[in-house]
Amino acid sequence: MNFVQENNHVLYLWAGTVGPEIEQEVNAIKTIPNVQVNVENVERLQLAEYGKSQFDVILAQVATGNSTLVTLLVKLLKPKGKCVFRDDSAASIEQARSNLLLAGFINIVASDSNVYVAEKPDYEVGSKSKLSFAKKSNVAAVWKLDDNEEEERIDDEELLDEDDKAKPTEESLRVCGTTGKRKACKDCSCGLAEELDAEAKGKALTDTSAAKSSCGSCYLGDAFRCATCPYLGMPAFKPGEKIVLTDTQMQADI
């Protein structure tokens, strides 16, 4: 009874028939001050309504190979509580130790008289703890802005000058023929390709300087032109500006 101390709550489990040695052991436990003892038959333990982590010490005449019962005893013990098994089976010390470890006991001590003392870990069965395996690195907050009112900031209104705000002219937007030699680009859309093609074929170009638009919106671009407008496909131009059209452009598609 060296495992029982003052103020302990003890569970005594017996198997078979009640003999005089059981009464002697229970009476010896009761002589320890402030000790509460519960005596229970092994076969009726699962029917008893004992709570989890209720006992400080359990004295059990239980075979360590009874995994169901051994696991139940782990739950009945308080953390760091001890359970003393008296195993009369033919199990070896190695086998008994393995059975107790698998049930959840630690610090198992065996004696030659088939008595095993096992301890419950210092935590409840089923408890969990968060494990952090990620290594934290000290990363500088590169994009963090300090709340400093004296810091110089760029005014977006100063990013553009008056020249940048000026509306570009048609000649400045014309890409073809800007290298000195009049040569149309591969995907010319400013009309130079048609102009050079007409000159190469010797075709006369139609002067539309005196032409008047019936809708008055031809110069705005294709989005504002009629379906039969001869200026379709040409860039926008200024009102009254001289525009040269080829013979093919003067013919309607339908």
Swiss-Prot record:
Pfam families: Anamorsin_N, CIAPIN1. Keywords: 2Fe-2S, 4Fe-4S, Cytoplasm, Iron, Iron-sulfur, Metal-binding, Mitochondrion. It is found in: Cytoplasm; Mitochondrion intermembrane space. InterPro entries: Anamorsin (IPR007785), Anamorsin_N_metazoan (IPR049011), CIAPIN1 (IPR046408), SAM-dependent_MTases_sf (IPR029063). Its main location: cytoplasm. A motif (Cx2C motif 2) lies at residues 226-229. Residues 4-133 are annotated as: N-terminal SAM-like domain. [2Fe-2S] cluster binds at residues 176, 185, 188, 190. GO terms for cellular component: cytoplasm; mitochondrial intermembrane space. GO terms for molecular function: 2 iron, 2 sulfur cluster binding; 4 iron, 4 sulfur cluster binding; electron transfer activity; metal ion binding. Residues 215-229 are annotated as: Fe-S binding site B. Gene3D superfamilies: Vaccinia Virus protein VP39 (3.40.50.150). Residues 134-165 are annotated as: Linker. One of its GO terms (biological process) is iron-sulfur cluster assembly. [4Fe-4S] cluster binds at residues 215, 218, 226, 229. Its cofactor is [2Fe-2S] cluster; [4Fe-4S] cluster. A motif (Cx2C motif 1) lies at residues 215-218. It comes from the Eukaryota. Residues 176-190 are annotated as: Fe-S binding site A. The C-terminal domain binds 2 Fe-S clusters but is otherwise mostly in an intrinsically disordered conformation. Component of the cytosolic iron-sulfur (Fe-S) protein assembly (CIA) machinery. Required for the maturation of extramitochondrial Fe-S proteins. Part of an electron transfer chain functioning in an early step of cytosolic Fe-S biogenesis, facilitating the de novo assembly of a [4Fe-4S] cluster on the cytosolic Fe-S scaffold complex. Electrons are transferred from NADPH via a FAD- and FMN-containing diflavin oxidoreductase. Monomer. HAMAP family: Anamorsin. Belongs to the anamorsin family. This is Anamorsin homolog. It comes from Anopheles gambiae. The lineage of its organism: Eukaryota, Metazoa, Ecdysozoa, Arthropoda, Hexapoda.
